[in-house]
Amino acid sequence: MSQKSLQIPAVPTGQTVITTFEMTPATATELMEALQSAFDEVIRHQVGFIGAALHMNDAMTRVCNYSQWRSRDDYKAMLRTPEMIARNRHILTLCKGFEPVMYEVARVV
């Protein structure tokens, strides 16, 4: 993933997606590598992608992905690509589950 700075716009626009993944320490590194690869090779090149950050807790049992998109439709279109369908199937084998939740920025402080 690129090292560009993730910024929350002062005027709430677009779509924020926060996805949490639950895994074991045994699969944490492989999961993070699969997510990094998905962002580097596919997601960052999709229409409407603004930026993202991956976070792992110190127990290596949870990953949180924060991503920003121009619109909800752009995010959904990325999920429907054959490449992401295949990658998400693989990612699901590395974790107990994952849950993307879509948010709109309500306030920036």
Per-region residue spans from a language model:
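An amphipathic, aromatic/His-enriched active-site/gating alpha helix that lines ligand/cofactor pockets
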Residues: 37-41, 45-50, 68-102
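Intrinsically disordered, low-complexity segments enriched in polar/charged residues with Gly/Pro
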Residues: 7-10, 27-29, 39-42, 53-56, ...
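Residue-level signal for functionally critical sites in structured catalytic/ligand-binding pockets
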Residues: 17-18, 31, 46
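Short, well-ordered beta-strand segments in beta-rich or mixed alpha/beta enzyme
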Residues: 15-22, 51-81
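Short acidic-aromatic low-complexity motifs
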Residues: 4, 25-26, 45-46
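Short, surface-exposed ligand-recognition loops at beta-strand->loop->(often short) alpha-helix junctions
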Residues: 22-35
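Intrinsically disordered, low-complexity acidic/polar segments
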Residues: 28-30, 74-76, 109
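Glycine-rich beta-strand-turn "strand-cap" elements at beta-sheet edges
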Residues: 1-15, 22, 53-60, 88-109
